[in-house]
Amino acid sequence: MIERGKFRSLTLVNWNGFFARTFDLDELVTTLSGGNGAGKSTTMAAFVTALIPDLTLLHFRNTTEAGATSGSRDKGLHGKLRAGVCYSTLDVVNSRHQRVIVGVRLQQVAGRDRKVDIKPFTIQGLPTAIQPTQILTEVVGERQARVLSLQELKESVEAMEGVQFKQFNSITDYHSLMFDLGVIPKRLRSSADRSKFYRLIEASLYGGISSAITRSLRDYLLPENSGVRKAFQDMEAALRENRMTLEAIRVTQSDRDLFKHLISEATSYVAADYMRHANERRIHLDGALVLRRELLASRKQLVTEQYRHVEMSRELAEQSGAESDLETDYQAASDHLSLVQTAMRQQEKIERYQSDLEELTYRLEEQNEVVAEASEQQADNEARAEAAELEVDELKSQLADYQQALDVQQTRAIQYQQALQALERARALCQLPELTADNAEDWLETFQAKEQEATEALLQLEQKLSVADAAHSQFEQAYQLVVSIAGQVSRSEAWQTARELLRDWPSQQHLAERVQPLRMRLSELEQRLRAQQDAERLLQEFCKRQGQAYQPEELEELQRELESTVEELSLSVSDAGERRMEMRQELEQIKLKIQELTARAPVWLAAQDALSQLSEQSGEALEDSRQVTECMQQLLERERETTVERDEVAAAKRAIDAQIERLSQPSGAEDSRMIALAERFGGVLLSEIYDDVTLDDAPYFSALYGPSRHGIVVPDLSLVRDQLAGLEDCPEDLYLIEGDPQSFDDSVFAVEELEKAVVVKIADRQWRYSRYPEVPLFGRAARENRLEALYQERDSLAERYATLSFDVQKTQRLHQAFSRFIGSHLAVAFDSDPEAEIRLLNTRRGEIERALNAHEERNQQQRQQFEQAKEGISALNRLIPLVSLLLDDTLADRVEEITEELTEAQEAARHIQKHGASLTKLEPLLAVLQSDPQQHEQLKENYAQAQNSQRQAKQQAFALVEVVQRRAHFGYTDSAGMLTENSDLNDKLRQRLEQAEAERTRAREQLRQYQAQFTQYNQVLASLKSSYDAKRDMLKELSQELVDIGVQADANAEARARTRRDELHAALSTNRSRRNQLEKQLTFCEAEMDSLQKKLRKLERDYHQIREQVVNAKAGWCAVMRMVKDNGVERRLHRRELAYMDGDELRSMSDKALGALRLAVADNEHLRDVLRMSEDPKRPERKIQFYIAVYQHLRERIRQDIIRTDDPVEAIEQMEIELGRLTEELTAREQKLAISSKSVSNIIRKTIQREQNRIRMLNQGLQAVSFGQVKSVRLNVNVREAHATLLDVLSEQQEQHQDLFNSNRLTFSEALAKLYQRLNPQMDMGQRLPQTIGEELLDYRNYLELEVEVNRGADGWLRAESGALSTGEAIGTGMSILVMVVQSWEEESRRLRGKDISPCRLLFLDEAARLDAKSIATLFELCERLEMQLIIAAPENISPEKGTTYKLVRKVFQNHEHVHVVGLRGFANEIPTLPSIPVEQ
């Protein structure tokens, strides 16, 4: 059992009072309870809007407006919405358990018209956990939400996997999808269907018996039998067409002779003139073509000479440019040679200065050492001289002081004081407080010993310091060498750096030694590279002259080819004379042959026309006479076979027609007698009961009932028994089955179903095994399916029969054509084509003439080729020795490699030259760098301390010496004593002064000598430094000059530069000789061009004269050709045999045809006028216009439905074949198309009977319905009396009215309307046409009257009218009618939707408070029995124990209006009250 689809919920978003509210719908009844204005009608309006979003239909009015035709401007929808985006959606689960959300987006449109914009959409595949409000709104706060726009809704839904969103621009598409998914019960194809559905919903919503529905119950309940109407319309159209075609055939037969005569004479008249003009035009064109060929040849020769001129000019320009480049290169090479020579001289200077600089460097280093030693000695001598001077000065001062004291008496006291001071100074210096003048001498010995020790210690330290200074100077020297070579390095890394420098020194020396060999190798490779470049330039020039690129390895093969070409060209020149004589002889023979073939061509062309016509008609390639004879025999055999096959097809078609007639019987009765027997027995054919069985179930029921499927179902077999006694007109086997036709099922048999078969237990000892038929015929669907196949087969057989009949007649006519051909043309038809031979001979003649004309040109070309080949061989002789050089691809790489090696070697040589001496000095000092004498500073400090100690000891000893020396002053007691002592002292002082002066003199002399020597050394050093700096600066300048020269000055540079200059000089000489040669050739070419231009001007003048004549005639001829081709008559007019007739013969032929045509078109004014205009000989196009007018006239008279061509000539052929056959076939077809009035009556009667049975079945579902005093509701179906009479007359008395149905002037519909008027003369048909009335009479619905009846109280069955019923009874009765309509729609649409879909059923009822409790209970029961959902609205909860009830209360809070909703499930379900959901604002 298929589960019926259900509406799960209704969701309103942004409606008045409903921001986001979802109403869960009960499976049976959903009640909306609330006071006035609570929002019940708004909720229902939202549901209806989502169901039928058609603004032309929607009109939500109050029940007080029921029946009103006009309401408020917005029809009740605009005021129910709030500003912004609004939604109304329905959540549906169909029979396939698919969840579908269908709904609409509504939005108020600004303006005074209060319009609303509606956009329907669907969402499929949404998970059940997601509620509609979740996808329609977006939460933006704790108690706030935002309504999504339709685009945002689409984007959010499409982001979910497996969910589909679809928006509709058409309500039809929206309803089509809803029907396919089982949401609505009927396919709403048009606005009329939508209107019916809306009226149904509206009637349900407002309750009561809707007059809009009861008045048109036939449209709601009875399906339109469009198939029957269309069949009648197609049949009548076919009859009309058939009669028109027959009439056209009769007209066309009378035109056939006129076609033949008119086409034949018009063709002769126009074709003769057409071919005459064509011949004349060809003669003029041939003359023009001869001149044009000469003109084109001259132009070609001129173009060739101009091309040669351009090429030579270009080559001359290239040679001139190359000469300029070569002169520039030659000058550059000469300059380069001068630079190389200058650089060589510069290099010699540099080498000379470098040797001088090396010698100066060595001498400068030696002189530096000498100056350093002299400087040390000078410093010692200066120190000694200074000490001597100091000692002399001191002695002199002492002596001066003493003598001065002698002059003054107080000198003694001064000396005594000086002695005391000297004693105190000695005590302080010697730190001897106990020192006295007496013991001073003893202490003097002690301190002199100390001084001796300090001096010895100082000497030892000085020796050590000198050794350390030597080591330190070596380290510093080595370190400075490393820095000068490698740049700044740390002292700790000096040894490692020096070791690396010395390790790399041998390899750099080796590289430096390779400079000269590498220079020689590079010079050699560069010379080869230049030679290769020159060879490539020669190859490029050679390829340019040859016009083709060659590879070096191809040159030898090319040389052999050129040599063979030279030989061939020399031979071809010798053969030219003999070839010229042969061509002239052949040209004469061709002219004679062409004359012979021209005489034979017309006869052969006539035979070929006949042969090609035979080939086209027979479809065979007739290549010889034997094939013609064989083909004629095959035609006889084909005619016999085709005739036999045509008769077989006719028999098969008759059999199919009989089968179609049998299957077309109403109610599926294959035997028409069964219908009469069923009416006689008061039963129903079993096939009629199962008429609605589906195509899939037809094989099962066909096998189930077996032979009894053609039986009759009767209510009681005993009542039939007596009627069987005298029964004669019946089938051999008649099956009668007892059962109720209204509720018949297949339970009368015990059945076991097998694979594609059934076993039926007829009795205990009798079983029947029946297989499913391959082609079931049980049920209307199966019969219609079989009939469709039979109709297609019959159509194909009819087409095949027509084709075969045409082929038979065509074969007969073709046989006659073969007979005529054999008698007239067989002798010459299969000869060779003279025109083809003439064309070949003309082609050959043209070739020979062109060959003769081109002979000299070819000789000249051969001579040019000979010269070019010789030049090519000469160039190849120069190139071939250079092939190996051209193939050396590695030469440039090797030059680059050697260049890199030379650069590296030169860098090494420069390094050795710059740092070689330093590396030589550094090598023996490498070990010194391993250890840095770090104690040198400490030793210096010790030395300084020893010096201090020694100086202090000297000072102490000197102080003691002074005390000892002044010891006498301590004894000055008197003057005499003092003088004596002073005299001794004076002598000593003078003695010491003499010694000191002598020492000073020696020191001064020695200092002067050393100073002169030191000055001499410094002068030598300065001279050396000056010479060194001058030579170094000069060397830098020379090196910079060499760099500025930019030339590599090696041993072979000058030889290479000189060789390069000589090569360029030779190339320049060759180029100049070639340029002179080109200038001579260019002069000769210009003279030749002048001669050709004179000849060309003469040819152009002659050609333009003759071409002007051709062009003058061409304008009319082009118009003629355009008309001929545009109208497709070229094949008729261009008759090749006429091309061999002269102009007089063609004029005679045209004049004879003109006379015949004047008589033929005498009765046709248009053709007569056109013919008269065509007689103008100066306007040939008018003859073509006449021919086209004749064709157009005949083409317009061809019946395209009979003859399958628009060519009158072919039409004549087809007319004679088709006319007889079509006349016979169409007459037979008209007889078959004629409709039996009895069959029409049976079809309409059976259709009425089937619909009566269907309505009885619908009535059974309403038998138990009761509302108030109404105990039952039913639908009564009656046939109108006048229409019933018409059916009786059609079936029983049709012979009396055959004057209507056999008339060729009336269609069947018109005849039916005339019969209806004849039977009912009292009826006024108004202004309607008989055709319209007849079409209405073919619609079975117009035969029926439908009435709704109720069984009410004591009145019994009476017509249901609102005035006779209470409000509740009227509502219940109307609801029952609506349920019946919905059921009828579902049955009617069952074939259109999927088998696994059972559509949703839902109706509305507003203001349900008008029903009492019993009526409400009846509604609940009706919903439960019919699986229907119902939404009702009432001010109070009318049935809380069942269904789902929503309590609606409209409230206003802070100027915001909202509806408070509380849901309540029925008590019977024992489900707690649904929680109240606060409204989101």
Swiss-Prot record:
Family matches, as Gene3D superfamilies: 1.10.287.1490, 1.20.58.850, 3.40.1140.10, Immunoglobulin FC, subunit C, MukB, hinge domain
Major location category of this protein: cytoplasm
UniProt record, GO biological process: cell division; chromosome condensation; chromosome segregation; DNA replication
Keyword Iron recorded: no
Any one GO MF annotation of this record: DNA binding
Residue sites binding ATP per the record: 34-41
Keywords: ATP-binding, Cell cycle, Cell division, Chromosome partition, Coiled coil, Cytoplasm, DNA condensation, DNA-binding, Nucleotide-binding
Location in or out of the cell: Cytoplasm, Nucleoid
Coiled coil: 338-480, 509-604, 780-805, 835-1116, 1210-1265
Gene Ontology cellular component list: cytoplasm; nucleoid
Chain intervals for the UniProt region annotation (Flexible hinge): 666-783
UniProt xrefs under Pfam families: MukB, MukB_hinge, SbcC_Walker_B
Cell division is among the record's keywords: yes
Database matches in NCBIfam families: PRK04863.1
Family, per entry: Belongs to the SMC family. MukB subfamily.
Written domain comment of the UniProt record: The hinge domain, which separates the large intramolecular coiled coil regions, allows the homodimerization, forming a V-shaped homodimer.
Complexes and interactors: Homodimerization via its hinge domain. Binds to DNA via its C-terminal region. Interacts, and probably forms a ternary complex, with MukE and MukF via its C-terminal region. The complex formation is stimulated by calcium or magnesium. Interacts with tubulin-related protein FtsZ.
Function noted in UniProt: Plays a central role in chromosome condensation, segregation and cell cycle progression. Functions as a homodimer, which is essential for chromosome partition. Involved in negative DNA supercoiling in vivo, and by this means organize and compact chromosomes. May achieve or facilitate chromosome segregation by condensation DNA from both sides of a centrally located replisome during cell division.
Protein known as: Chromosome partition protein MukB
Encoding gene, per UniProt annotation: mukB
